[in-house]
Amino acid sequence: MATQVMGQSSGGGSLFNNSANMGMALTNDMYDLHELSKAELAAPQLIMLANVALTGEASGSCCDYLVGEERQMAELMPVGDNHFSESEGEGLEESADLKGLENMELGSLELSAVEPQPVFEASAAPEIYSANKDPAPETPVAEDKCRSSKAKPFRCKPCQYEAESEEQFVHHIRIHSAKKFFVEESAEKQAKAWESGSSPAEEGEFSKGPIRCDRCGYNTNRYDHYMAHLKHHLRAGENERIYKCIICTYTTVSEYHWRKHLRNHFPRKVYTCSKCNYFSDRKNNYVQHVRTHTGERPYKCELCPYSSSQKTHLTRHMRTHSGEKPFKCDQCNYVASNQHEVTRHARQVHNGPKPLNCPHCDYKTADRSNFKKHVELHVNPRQFNCPVCDYAASKKCNLQYHFKSKHPTCPSKTMDVSKVKLKKTKKREADLLNNAVSNEKMENEQTKTKGDVSGKKNEKPVKAVGKDASKEKKPGSSVSVVQVTTRTRKSAVAAETKAAEVKHTDGQTGNNPEKPCKAKKNKRKKDAEAHPSEEPVNEGPVTKKKKKSECKSKIGTNVPKGGGRAEERPGVKKQSASLKKGTKKTPPKTKTSKKGGKLAPKGMGQTEPSSGALAQVGVSPDPALIQAEVTGSGSSQTELPSPMDIAKSEPAQMEVSLTGPPPVEPAQMEPSPAKPPQVEAPTYPQPPQRGPAPPTGPAPPTGPAPPTEPAPPTGLAEMEPSPTEPSQKEPPPSMEPPCPEELPQAEPPPMEDCQKELPSPVEPAQIEVAQTAPTQVQEEPPPVSEPPRVKPTKRSSLRKDRAEKELSLLSEMARQEQVLMGVGLVPVRDSKLLKGNKSAQDPPAPPSPSPKGNSREETPKDQEMVSDGEGTIVFPLKKGGPEEAGESPAELAALKESARVSSSEQNSAMPEGGASHSKCQTGSSGLCDVDTEQKTDTVPMKDSAAEPVSPPTPTVDRDAGSPAVVASPPITLAENESQEIDEDEGIHSHDGSDLSDNMSEGSDDSGLHGARPTPPEATSKNGKAGLAGKVTEGEFVCIFCDRSFRKEKDYSKHLNRHLVNVYFLEEAAEEQEEQEEREEQE
């Protein structure tokens, strides 16, 4: 960066680098301008440069005039006269008391001479005028004013004159001549000076704007500048001295500012940019300018990523963080963080002067930038075209908003507004005046619009397919999202609303039969892309969808496979979205019930069952039959009678939950007896584990207590936690490792398998069976009609207000923690839960179906879902747990006691209790096996994981089965809850959600931490009792779902996801579904 500093000696040395004197001979004619009349001079434009110097006498030996050895200000005035008059000299003497302007960096302004430095911006080193050089021939002013299209190296800053050669530039400077700077003590004297020194025409030309000060003649087009100027008058009072620049219109009452202003015209040092024509006499300005080329932004905000090249910008930015608003409107109480806002306010509210008038309309403003933008709208209206539709915006911001609101599902490429092409338009005048130009413009626009329309057409079918068929690329189509939201909302409303949902989904599917087909086709295409052959692809998505939508898709799917797919997806999406929403809002159904009229817990569990599980109830009341169907074909699971059955089974489930297992529908009752035999089958492996179970005898009592704890929140992952808790309780030493194994392999797959089979055994039946079976498990696993101990958990209790639930949960958590601590289960739980969480995290993240399955499992959140190799049993323990937890600590204690008794009984009768629990784990493993058999082609990863897990799980699960049956719900809640939350959080990412969610239960930020005696366990509200062991002091608890996080980072991410869900539920659901579908395809 060549910076040229043109020094000038105070002693009057030459201004240029060489001491050689400029050859601008100054005779009595003064600058050889005697021939030019005053009118011919560029006096009005005499804004003598930032770069010019008046040079010495005729001898040229010195640049300074010394008269009487007194220094006086140089008087720059139009050169009509040959020399300065005595009166002018006297005027200069009056201002001599300013003591020279060397302090002002004007160098030495001698009598009748000013030493501004000529700056030749174009050249790195300005050429030196030789002493012998003759003045350039005088040329008419017209030539001086002419502008050449070529880049000219010599520019006069004040008047923007550009010269091609040095001679022209020197001549232009001489024409400017020396115009006097003078300072008057009063406005009257200045007025006289103006009258004597310049003509009215000149004054008019000097006029800078419509706003003029009556006291000193200051004028500007900036209202804020004018107001600031008036303050100077107020400060100075009546005896003010007005300092005025005659080269320009600058006027001030401050000597300091006046001297500072003079530097603009007579810079002592000039810093020139080597990359452009910029130059400045202020080093700070020059350095800031250089940063525009280098991109350096040294001033960074410590609170956000903002950075700036100027400190003033950073200072202004920091006000956005501090909220400081130092600028106040003079006419009202309006305050702002910067003066520009105040000026705008004054202009808009107080009707400040608006000198700029739009030639096309009545628009007026004082802001040039706004004026230009406004006029541009007349000339080029709506020049930003949407590449997707016919919409055209006048501003980029409007087009960007259009993208987000109208095309949220379009590829990100089209979202890049910076790449949006503008309409080809001519300049305003051409557009306004030339019809031909306008016609061409219209043609160009039409062609562009045609291209846009064609592009839109190409994209529209995709959109239609996406909307109708859940969009090929984005699994979460608008239609599926709508269905999801409607189902989730209806399910949240009530079981009746669930039936309405079923009808609605049926109506939707019936009304839009093509959409499912398209969705199927799109899904098949996606599957085909993911898999070489469509058959395996279909099988994979079908099986996965079976996992996800065996319960969900059955609601509205008449076709077992194709329709099942199309509807399974919407159903799965809806149900999964509902589960996600429910879980996000409140991992326990309790919270979801609050949202959806507190039927959501039921709806969460029942909504999915209603859509898929209830359908399954209608399809096959017997779990064995359902399992057989599942194993046989996922299409059988997607039978159309399911909607009717769902509508029926949902109320039945509601009744069952309220009345208990006894009112369970015959179909549900049948599955319960069928399940006991299933339990018996897995029971055989359990008896061998009974040995370990007795050692964990203390665990059983604790097992029931934990189930009650997690039960309220844990309807989501009952399947998986059940094995984890039993393993933690009964076989802590030997079972703990298997539990982790089972958790990673069996638990997540059981989640999927159970989810698959749970829908298959009919979730309503499972719910009722859960009520009956858990009662059997708690009281006596063999008798199906012993649910009284479990106390049929009324979902109405789940629907209790969240505050009451939290209070009851807190008391429960405290008691549970005490019980667990007394039993010593907390550490076991922690280790196993951690392992289970990891395992749950691993499977759910890669296979989206597992999260969906988890969400389906979530549907029976309130019920423990125990799955045997053939069928699944849903235990109302979770319901009872959450209900009791929500109801009262006494009930919780009673439930714990009953659970302990049942666990002891189960330990004594391992075949039964273990069978029931083993149903959860062995069922999960068996389900994994069955599902793996069904879905081996589609889900080899899950199947393999589930199958290897299944053999160890039956043994381990059965060992821990009796107490674990009761304890399983809480752990499952933790795991399933985490998985559900993962799905919810999976909206952003499926990976690591379990860890962050499970690791975070008991946050100080949640506000719930203080109320809980033991944050680790207490933080795991009912369903998080399993995770309670992990919770430690200082953790962060989510205020929405009470999930605890050990790391603030994870907690903040989780909280942000809740917020996103609150404001963008549909979009989030769509994204989640898309991710899940992608995973399925992969």
UniProtKB/Swiss-Prot annotation:
The modification Phosphoserine is found at residue 950. Keywords: Cytoplasm, Metal-binding, Nucleus, Phosphoprotein, Repeat, Repressor, Transcription, Transcription regulation, Ubl conjugation, Zinc, Zinc-finger. GO terms for biological process: auditory receptor cell stereocilium organization; cardiac muscle cell myoblast differentiation; cellular response to electrical stimulus; cellular response to glucocorticoid stimulus; cellular response to stress; chromatin remodeling; detection of mechanical stimulus involved in sensory perception of sound; hematopoietic progenitor cell differentiation. It comes from the Eukaryota. GO terms for molecular function: chromatin binding; DNA binding; DNA-binding transcription factor activity; DNA-binding transcription repressor activity, RNA polymerase II-specific; identical protein binding; RNA polymerase II cis-regulatory region sequence-specific DNA binding; RNA polymerase II core promoter sequence-specific DNA binding; RNA polymerase II-specific DNA-binding transcription factor binding. A zinc finger (C2H2-type) spans 154-176, 211-235, 243-265, 271-293, 299-321, 327-350, 356-378, 384-407, 1036-1058. Residues 408-809, 831-1027 are annotated as: Disordered. Expressed in the hippocampus, including quiescent neuronal progenitor (QNP) cells, transient-amplifying progenitor (TAP) cells, neuroblasts and mature neurons (at protein level). Expressed in embryonic stem cells (at protein level). Expressed in many non-neuronal tissues including the heart and liver. Abundantly expressed in osteoblastic lineage cells. Expressed in the spleen, kidney, blood cells, cortex, neocortex and in the utricle, saccule and organ of Corti of the inner ear. Isoform 2: Expressed in the cortex, neocortex and in the utricle, saccule and organ of Corti of the inner ear. Residues 985-1063 are annotated as: Interaction with RCOR1. Residues 477-497 have a biased composition (Low complexity). Residues 43-57 are annotated as: Interaction with SIN3B. Residues 196-207 are annotated as: Required for binding to the neuron-restrictive silencer element. Induction: Down-regulated in differentiating neurons and mature neurons. Residues 684-713, 729-751 have a biased composition (Pro residues). Residues 140-413 are annotated as: Interaction with ZFP90. GO terms for cellular component: cytosol; nucleoplasm; nucleus; transcription repressor complex. Disruption phenotype: Embryonic lethality by embryonic day 11.5 dpc. At 9.25 dpc, disorganization of the head mesenchyme in the midbrain region with separation of myotomal cells from the dermomyotome and widespread apoptotic cell death. Forebrain malformation and widening of the mesencephalic flexure at 9.5 dpc and 10.5 dpc, and growth retardation by 10.5 dpc. Conditional knockout in the nervous system results in a progressive age-related neurodegenerative phenotype. Residues 440-475, 798-807, 854-864 have a biased composition (Basic and acidic residues). O-glycosylated. Phosphorylated; phosphorylation is required for ubiquitination. This is RE1-silencing transcription factor. It comes from Mus musculus (Mouse). The gene is Rest.
